Amino acid sequence: MNSDEWQIEITKFEKLVNEISNISNKKTKTIISADHGLVNINDEFRHYLNYGDDLQIYGDQRSVYINGAKENVLETFSEIPGVLLEQHELSYLLGDPIDEFLQSIYPDFCFLVEDKNIVYPKHLSAKLKGYHGGISEEELKIPIIEFSNF
């Protein structure tokens, strides 16, 4: 947020809002909301993962699914603030995989990254400045915009 790109998008949005307000000859009220908020991720909280081909990392960048040997997982995530959940603990959150497809995608581990942190697996090239998710209290605040032409 507050980047040049962000300001350009806000300007476009404000122009659209004005056009919507001016297009109707009737009194209208418009409400815009999102499913959840957005947080900035500062450089010092971005963690680039270094791991071998013996680990498979997928899923979200803050609730990271991992397949591989536990010792390799612990080594890869040793410097990153968060909590490692093992497969038996995941079943309390995700339920047990009930068919062959779910078993094929069910992870060995899930690493839950602490608030304000994010991980970058090797396969991810995007340089995120923020994160649109729902893990932190800040992200649970739903942005709502209201405007009317009367």
What residue spans do the PLM features occupy?
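Feature captures the catalytic ectodomains and active-site-proximal regions of enzymes
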Residues: M1-F150
